[in-house]
Each structure stands twice: as structure tokens, then as C-alpha cells.
Amino acid sequence: CRHAKGEPVEYALRAAGLGLAEIGFSDHIPAEEDGFDDWRMLRSEFPEYLEKVAQAKREVPDVTVRLGLEVDFLEGEGATEWINELSQLADFDYLIGSVHYIAPGWDIDNPRWIGRWSGEAEVEEIWSAYWQIYHRCARSGLFDIIAHPDLPKKFGFTPSGDLRRYYEPTVQAALDADLAIEINTAGWRKDCAEQYPARTFLEMMHSAGVPLVISSDAHAPEEVGADFPRAARLALEVGFTHTARFCGRRRQLVPIDPTLAEKADESER
């Protein structure tokens, strides 16, 4: 995508160097019309993305390379058909559903629009709009995983009150749709300084039996695997014992390695 750096081969080499068993590539899906925004690949670049991931598979045999897409859930005429069309162009291992836009031209995690978070009423309005779309994303039946659930907290803005009012419908939707949800470590690198999603959300996931994926959301090779020990420790503390992996859009549960979590303790000494 146009807000990342490096080539898939570099990411795969980093994963291999860290001793990771596999790495998944999940570039943002191109929009049906070029010019939709300035941070995703163009339609014409989609075949190049597929080839570069295939190249990483060939050139870095020490790590399993999975092919995915992060799919912005956009509502409107033809949106679902476009997702289905692109998803048939390769043998994807997984599709991740995400929400960035709550209105045309307004991607809420874009620093360009930070001035719109001007007060408590605006924060509540943005969060409410986001989660309504996110619930529909989870229930759409299009995806295997849903990404960074509480993304609206990226800049540190959260509404007052019990946030479980937003979390509960999403956890139920994920359970009903048989989706996995990620711990996304990128949140620790943002203003919110907290993983996506919050611990309370993770606890609700575990209680409901929703599977977990751990993701670094790397946009540079050096971010591959970032804070994985910390995420593994958190997952184990909440009660998770396995994470989900995907191959050919089929899910497999793999035990969390407790020695990975121990590395988080070592780094804090």
C-alpha cells in the first residue's frame, strides 16, 4: 500500500530472522475507482501485489508465506460485488474485514481529519457511527478475520461510560459469523499506546469463544513481529491458549507458545 515501505521479500526475511513460523500479507484492497484515496494500491497494481507475495514465497522458504487482503468494508452499490470479484483472482488464504471510513471521504484514522474530534459529543458520534458499520462488516459473511476493532481510539479519543455497549454486539456478530478477531500490536505504536482491541474486549471474546489472531500490522519490515511477546502474554493472561492461522480460507488453531510470552517479561527487566 502507499503508506508502507519495503518489499514483501524483506518482510518475509524479517519474519524468518525472528523465527516466526509464518507471515501473512494483507495489503489494502484497491478501490473500484482509482483516486478513492491516496493510501491504497491502484487497480493496475493488484497483479503486481500478487506476484510480489508469490516471489516472497519462492525466495524465503524458511517461513510460510500466506496471501491475504485487508478489505475496507464500504457500503454502497456494487461494493460487495467488487470484493467478491477481487477475491476470485487468486487463491487467498484469508480476507480481513476492516472499517476506516464512516462517511464518504472521511477515514477516521487519518491524521488529516484529527480536527473533527473536537469534543465529547463528536467523539460519541464518531464512535457510534463506526461501530454500527463495524457490526455490519462482521455480519457480512465476506471475511475470515476482522481487524483492529476499536480503531477510533487511535488518537486517544474515547467516549465516557462503559465501552462494552460497543463491544458486545461485535463479539456476538463475530461469534455468529464464525470469525476470528485480531490482537493488533500497532496500537502500542500509536497515540492510544494500547493494543487493538482493549483488554475488556479481549476478555469478552474469550468468554464467548471467539478465536484470536495476533498481528503486528507491519508497514515496514522492522515492524514485523513487533510486540508479539507482549501480545502473547496478554492473550494468555486473558485465558486464550491458541491462536488462529489460515490456509485456503480454512482456519486452524495453534497453541500459543508460552516461551514467547516469557520474552515480554525478560524485556521489561
Language model features with spans:
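Extended substrate/RNA-proximal surfaces in nucleic-acid metabolism proteins
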Residues: R43-A177, T259-E268
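A short, mixed-charge helix-start or loop-turn motif at secondary-structure junctions
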Residues: G35, R116-G119, I183, V213
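Conserved radical SAM core fold
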Residues: P30-E33, I102, V213
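Charged catalytic cores and adjacent phosphate/nucleic-acid-binding surfaces used
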Residues: A4-Y11, G19, K153, T158-R269
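Hydrophobic faces of well-ordered beta-strands that scaffold small-molecule active sites
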Residues: I23-F25, V65-L69, L95-G97, I145-A147, ...
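Non-catalytic positions within long, well-ordered alpha-helices that form the structural scaffold/packing
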Residues: A16, Q88, A138-R139, H206, ...
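An N-terminally biased module of ancient metal coordination in phosphate/nucleic-acid-related enzymes
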Residues: C1-E77, N84, I145, P152-R165, ...
